[in-house]
Amino acid sequence: MAVGHYDLKRTKNKQYYFNLKASNGEVILTSEMYTTKAAANKGIRSVQANSPAEKNFEIRENKSGKSYFVLKARNYQVIGISESYDNEVAVKKGIQSAIKHGSSVNVRDLTKSE
C-alpha cells in the first residue's frame, strides 16, 4: 500500500515549512512558515494528530471564487492550507486525500541537503 509523506523544507530566508504529499507525489497541503525546525516538526505532528477527523477541515473560497480547504488543530489554529480547486467535488477529494495520507510518519527532511 502506497502512503503519503511530509517534505520538510527551508526557505532562502531560513524559514521552515512542510508539504504533505500523496503517494503519487502531489502536494495535498502546505504549512505556515516556522522560525525553527523544531516548530515545523511540531506542526507535522499536529497534522498527523488532526487530519484523521473530517470535522477538523474547513472549506473556504478565495477572492477569485475557487475553493480550498484548511486543516485546523484542536485550538482552531490553521495548521495546513490546500491548493485551490475548481469545484466542491474536487476540494472534497482533496480533504479525503489529506485524511488518508495525513497520519503518515514518513518525514523527508530536505533541509539537510541545503
Swiss-Prot record:
Residue spans of the Sequence repeats: 11-59, 62-110
Keywords for this protein: Repeat
Record carries keyword Repeat: yes
InterPro entries assigned to the protein according to its UniProt record, in alphabetical order: DUF1508 (IPR010879), UPF0339_domain (IPR051141), YegP-like_sf (IPR036913)
SUPFAM superfamilies from the UniProt entry: YegP-like
A Pfam family hit: DUF1508
Keyword Cytoplasm: no
Domain of life: Bacteria
Family: Belongs to the UPF0339 family. Duplicated subfamily.
Protein name listed in UniProt: UPF0339 protein plu2779
